[in-house]
Design a protein with these regions (language model features):
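ABC transporter nucleotide-binding domain
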Residues: 159-246
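ABC transporter nucleotide-binding domains
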Residues: 2-193, 199
Length: 247
């Protein structure tokens, strides 16, 4: 709760090792709050969470080092190069410089390693945050809307990397408001609305249960037209599932 407002209520789920689990819903549904509770940034008023087979409150410092959080909060020196920024994190974990090279290649930023952080584009910064979270080879990785606001090319690169990490055995939690992204990445997902879990399962099972399409015709300035088929957005899908109006 935040004051009298209930942010999340009666949420229960299990996640298998090595799968990508998604939280799907519109703004204000509780996705980010869920990530903050799971990563220890917020404390739940009741119930408990378990990670790495332990109740979260009993995780040791060594356990916490196995949990990666992709965050765009402070922690980078704008005037230092991308390489030197990541090198500082590697030293904190006792990792060699070769690990910095590895993660830079993973996120496709190796050729930009000498750029200062202030000169990176939005997409490059997002991959920089991901590289920081990967330095210590975490067993569990949390991402809050990892491709929000990014161009399709950068989004595709991040999607490909997340699928590679999954194949390597990393368990991944992510939030998204994009059903297409959830379908592409997630083994299972939960649909959230106003703090309630209203649907839970594989993307395929949810799509099969609520199989609706919309055909949209776009007219461009040069008067060319194209027709695209869109799955219902999560906002509409959540509205259908919850039978509640959403402001």
């Amino acid at each position: 709760k935040f004051g009298q407002k209930v942010a999340l209520e009666e949420i229960s789920f299990e996640v298998n090792k090595g799968e990508i689990f998604g939280f799907l819903g519109p703004s204000g549904s509780g996705k980010t709050t869920m990530i903050k509770i799971l990563t220890g940034q917020l404390n739940a008023d009741s119930g408990q969470t378990e990670l790495l087979g332990k109740v979260s409150e009993k995780l040791t410092p060594a356990d916490l080092e196995q949990i990666g959080l992709v965050s765009d909060t402070s922690g980078f020196y704008e005037k230092l190069s991308l390489y030197k920024n990541l090198q500082a994190y590697a030293k904190l974990y006792g990792k060699p410089n070769s690990r910095v090279d590895e993660v830079l290649k993973q996120v496709d930023l190796y050729d930009s390693k000498n750029l200062t952080a202030e000169k990176l584009s939005t997409g490059m910064k997002q991959r920089m945050f991901l590289a920081r979270a990967l330095i210590n080879k975490p067993q569990v990785l949390f991402l809050d809307e990892p491709t929000s606001g990014l161009d399709p090319t950068t989004s595709k690169k991040i999607h490909e990397l997340l699928l590679e990490l999954k194949e390597a055995g990393t368990t991944i939690f992510l939030t998204t408001h994009d059903m297409n992204e959830a379908t592409l990445l997630c083994d299972r997902l939960s649909l959230l609305n106003r703090g309630h879990l209203i649907e839970y399962g594989t993307p395929a099972s949810i799509i099969q249960k609520y199989n609706h399409e919309k055909k949209v015709q776009l007219t461009f300035p040069d008067e060319t037209k194209t027709q695209i088929t869109l799955w219902e957005t999560s906002l509409i899908l959540v509205k259908k599932l919850s039978n509640r109006s959403i402001v």
